[in-house]
Amino acid sequence: MDGTMGLQGLLCLCLASHLALQAMPTQGSPTDSTKGNKAVNGVVIRSLKVNCKVTSRFAHYVVTSQVVNNTNKPKEVAFDVEIPKTAFISDFAITADENTFVGDIKDKVTAWKQYRKAAISGENSGLVRASGRTMEQFTIHVTIGPRSKATFQLTYEEVLRRKLTQYDIVIKVKPKQLVQHFEIDVDIFEPQGISKLDAQASFLSKEAAAQLIKKSFSGKKGHVLFRPTVGQQQSCSTCSTTLLNGDFKVTYDVNREKLCDLLVANNYFAHFFAPQNLTKLNKNVVFVIDISSSMEGQKVKQTKEALLKILSDLKPGDYFDLVLFGSAVQSWRGSLVQASTANLDAARSYVRQFSLAGSTNLNGGLLRGIEILNKAQGSLPEFSNRASILIMLTDGEPTEGVTDRSQILKNVRDAIRGRFPLYNLGFGHDVEWNFLEVRALENNGRAQRIYEDHDSAQQLQGFYDQVANPLLKDVELQYPADAVLALTQHRHKQYYEGSEITVAGRIADNKLSSFKADVQASGDQGFKTTCLVDEEEMKKLLQERGHMLENYVERLWAYLTIQELLAKRMKLEWAEKASVSAKALQMSLDYQFVTPLTSMTIRGMADKDGLEPVIDKPLEDSQPLEMLGPRRKFVLSASQPSPTHPSSSIQKLPDRVTGVDTDPHFIIRVPQKEDTLCFNINEEPGVVLSLVQDPDTGFSVNGQLIGNEARCPGKHEGTYFGRLGIANPATGFQLEVTPQNITLNPGSGGPVFSWRDQASLRQDEVVVTINRKRNLGVVREDGGTFEVVLHRLWKGSAIHQDFLGFYVLDSHRMSARTHGLLAQFFHPFDYKVSDIHPGSDPTKTDATMVVKNRQLTVTRGLQKDYSKDPRHGLKVTCWFIHNNGDGLIDGVHTDYIVPDIF
């Protein structure tokens, strides 16, 4: 395809669970139109569809858009989608010119190696950037050919969280041109039954919304459909501009007559806990406020505004105090006082009058607030029965008193001792976010950023509203230890009105009959209940929702588990952090989620530097969108990616490698000699040869020979590797590779992949990456990088069977005792070649080689190395050792025959 960039025609789609859709034209005037669509530089958005399926809070979104280039020149098109920060991308594909380019998810370290060139140059090859308060912006620019079309499809998933008595799905709609087929379709299935459902659009009058938005719910099902015609999209009857510009919002809640909402499918369960009609607990609350000089201006003004409103919301049964910290620490009363009218009036006066002072004694402010709550709980029994809450607001980092982050974390942990939650609010982008979040997570709370904007006071108030009405404290959801194999967080310090606690887990085989949930908590009165599984009801639900229910319950568990592991790793260091990170990475790969530990690449696309695009998940501390450099532009190949390109998931290959391929030729790289040696092994089909054996770790690679399907009896014919076994008994890792399938842990019924798959797998310290129809990489974290090459043969080939090649890319960290037909050559050895002369074959040269105190006749010849080019191979000049490597290998070749590949 011609890579020339024309004038830009941009499709912009912004999505959230919170979703937003947006299409933005660029410079230049419209030049064409199709069936009522107004073209932007000849590029038309033919269709734009958002499909959202919610099953028991698990939301699965698919955004699909088709654009058409009606010009005779290539055009640049951008697909732009905003997704919530809490969501994980799980799939992306582009179809253009009858070719489909799909995303591959792999671990971030592997992906980073591929894109280190872009990172070093300072350019940004990432497609996802932080955008706004709750969103991440996904954007990809591609060039499509003349008179052609491109279809983009993005999939992402999340678990909807209940806030203030409802679940929200918000779609920001801004296509910037009329769209022939525009559709938002939301399908909701909730086993508890839907209690309310509404949908509104900020860009439509109430009358127009009632006419255009179709919404209905009955029993377990709810549906919202917005499908305006081109005429209904017009801003006026004679206009060519669109009125679709604003928020499309769906809200719903579920029935809660039953205390128990326990869902089980395919040995996974989800437990939703949100009891109603409970008496609100009185609370002890201390507000710890940063009054350092950096809070000057709008920050302190809006903080005071929010505090005044929050004080007005306190109930007479609540107790409270205020702590201010700058260079010094001051408290309003120094102990909790009742939220009486007189005390509230005095507190409001104090808030209006306080002024800013100096630096940031964060440690001192927090410890003073904790001391006030601890003192109250220890002094009077009635205080201990209340729900205690500590809320801290700061805009910066500690600069006064104790400033060491580790020491502050320890001081706060030791002072709170798990008695109550700490909520940290960070004002603006200068706040040290990771430190803020870890401090909250270590103390049963959470962190939230308050953005510097006209509505900062409303943001503060909005956060407080979520924790203003505690109903229960010390909530524990318990499950039989022998029936549950994996479990998400099931202990919570407090449960607040309008929220929901969600626990998910995996049930052991044959343990469903003994599975139950015991819930206990402290409230106005003691709270205790037991939930059992209604198996008949589960069967009915499976009949209604089928595979979708089974799949979504498991993915809900995976989503929650990954989120919790990512949060947990922030609190850990060194080996513990590495262990938790490895678990989160493995689950991200298993369930194909783009998380902070994984990346998605799109094969078959490249920018001007030949780099494929990469989809990452930005961290909360990522720079705002406008602070980042220009995005890279990618061109779709006319066909699928060429096999001549090195694998993206395998490190850069040395100029020459050690390996074995074809019938079977062993190629031994001798770097200290800057030379290569070769030999063949002639054995019968079915024989298994030991290629690598490390007795110190148990790691091994064995290969089984196959022959020509049409062999002639009595005639020697070539053999090839048709089956490889890679194993590490110490960790239970086994990988069986054939030209048809790749099987992880075949002895225990592990997953099976075909060579048509693209996947990255991790087990313990081994990472396996499958590159579709080409090769497979195996990386041991403690040493050793290997590649398996797939040889697919054409129908007219004389061999008649597909086979495998095996290459060693890095062996320098393997133990000194590693051995095998290949591995014995990982260690340095010496030889001398002399008496080079014409051989019996006039086209080849013979010589005398002295190696291992033996004198051999060797022949100069050519072999092929397929590690870089699996299809054609690269010619390698080598000294060929005859008679099965006799004299070069230790012992004789039959010493390396083993019973099986494992």
Swiss-Prot record:
Coiled coil: none annotated. One of its GO terms (biological process) is hyaluronan metabolic process. One of its GO terms (cellular component) is extracellular region. Keywords: Glycoprotein, Phosphoprotein, Protease inhibitor, Proteoglycan, Secreted, Serine protease inhibitor, Signal. SMART domains: VIT, VWA. I-alpha-I plasma protease inhibitors are assembled from one or two heavy chains (HC) and one light chain, bikunin. Inter-alpha-inhibitor (I-alpha-I) is composed of ITIH1/HC1, ITIH2/HC2 and bikunin. Interacts with TNFAIP6 (via Link and CUB domains). PROSITE patterns: VIT, VWFA. Glycans are attached at residues 52, 69, 277, 639, 644, 741. This is Inter-alpha-trypsin inhibitor heavy chain H1. Disulfide bonds: none annotated. Residues 29-158 form the VIT domain. One of its GO terms (molecular function) is serine-type endopeptidase inhibitor activity.
